Amino acid sequence: MLGGRSLPATDLARAAQISRSTASAHIAQLTTSGLVVVERRGRHRFHRLADERVAEAIERLAAIAPAQPVRSLQESNRATAHRAARSCYDHLAGTLGVAVAEALCEAGALDRASLELRAPDRFAALGVEVDALGRGRRPLTRSCLDWSERRPHLAGELGAAMLTALLDRAWLVRRPAGRAVAVTPRGAAGLDDVLGIDVAALAPVAIDRTPLRRVA
């Protein structure tokens, strides 16, 4: 759910490696507390985080939680992919997310201390129409502590719009499972041109040259 998706209880139980009844009990408590929202689609029920603030709280808790042991190559590869680049609710996180936020600060587009917007032109080069944002109740920008980097990445409406733009431009593509996203060759060139980010030198981020089916 940290990826901003709505999922059935069966999928959540499988991911947590618990029974469906146990998962349903936990989901009920989270729903009652207002942390999770239930969406009904016909006879089916899907569950998602209530909003970005819940996702941010989970990221902050994960940043201080002890690391989980890795027991297989598959788990290791998945953990590496998530550390490199992933979605945090609806914005970009991981090593790449932090690098993008820092590059935007270096360019004067964001205030380094608060990540507040300073110059919208740099976002236009990323495909974000800043003038169309900031009309709702959601904060335009928000600093979100990255659990894997222990440094902030950009959240808020602007952070969400930026991730959407990078996906729409095919600079990033979603992995078929989980929250990980991959940088395409086009994205590596674009990030270097606009923000001066050398993706090839940004371990553990790697340029994925394998054609990937875009996942909604």
Q: What are the roles of these predicted feature ranges?
A:
Residues 31-41, 45-48, 113-114, 175-176:
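Beta-hairpin "wing" of winged helix-turn-helix
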Residues 24-25, 98:
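Conserved catalytic core of two-component sensor histidine kinases
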